């Protein structure tokens, strides 16, 4: 799907499973943004199937859900197109990044009370949160610069972090696949009940 200006995304269906039972059987419908290879997170549950890997695993149910993958993908492309044209201010973007980064210091009221995010960045609870700082810096230096102050830019900053950022601790890097899955879940949870859901 081409969202314009060569911004192309392709359908991706991923399957995860573990032989030791630590993960359930999981099928995800998503996309890859070709320009940056970000894994794009679908925000609704229609795009995934999850079940414990037991004798009762119902693959027919999984197949029925996956049969709708193209329709879900097409709808998601329409949503992304809307996000490209929907402005988002720095305070709102920063508040969403703070939810993803689990920075409890930032609440809607505090984030909106600051008209300049630069002042928020001086707060110790904020600048110590490496995830929040990485999200914000990537947004400002890359996504906002190239895509404008839009929901699409905010979304792409989050998917960049989920896809490309190293683990915070070097000892956790060997488990980066599980970390990336957890990051995608954090994005889904963080954007619920925000402007992203309203525009979807």
Task: Describe the residue ranges of each PLM region.
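Intrinsically disordered, low-complexity regions enriched in serine/threonine
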Residues: 3-200
């Amino acid at each position: 799907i081409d969202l314009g200006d060569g911004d192309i995304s392709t359908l991706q269906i991923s399957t995860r499973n573990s032989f030791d039972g630590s993960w359930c059987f999981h099928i995800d419908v998503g996309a890859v943004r070709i320009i940056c290879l970000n894994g794009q997170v679908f925000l609704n549950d229609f795009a995934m199937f999850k079940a414990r890997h037991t004798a009762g695993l119902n693959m027919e149910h999984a197949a029925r859900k996956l049969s709708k993958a193209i329709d879900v993908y097409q709808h998601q492309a329409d949503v992304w197109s809307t996000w490209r044209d929907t402005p988002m201010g720095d305070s709102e973007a920063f508040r969403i990044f703070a939810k993803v980064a689990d920075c409890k210091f930032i609440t809607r009221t505090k984030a909106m009370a600051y008209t300049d995010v630069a002042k928020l960045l001086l707060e110790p609870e904020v600048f110590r949160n490496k995830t929040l700082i990485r999200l914000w810096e990537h947004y400002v230096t890359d996504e906002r610069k190239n895509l404008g102050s839009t929901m699409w830019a905010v979304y792409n900053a989050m998917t960049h972090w989920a896809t490309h950022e190293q683990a915070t601790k070097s000892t956790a890097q060997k488990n980066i696949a599980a970390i990336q899955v957890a990051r995608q879940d954090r994005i889904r949870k963080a954007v619920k009940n925000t402007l992203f859901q309203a525009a979807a």
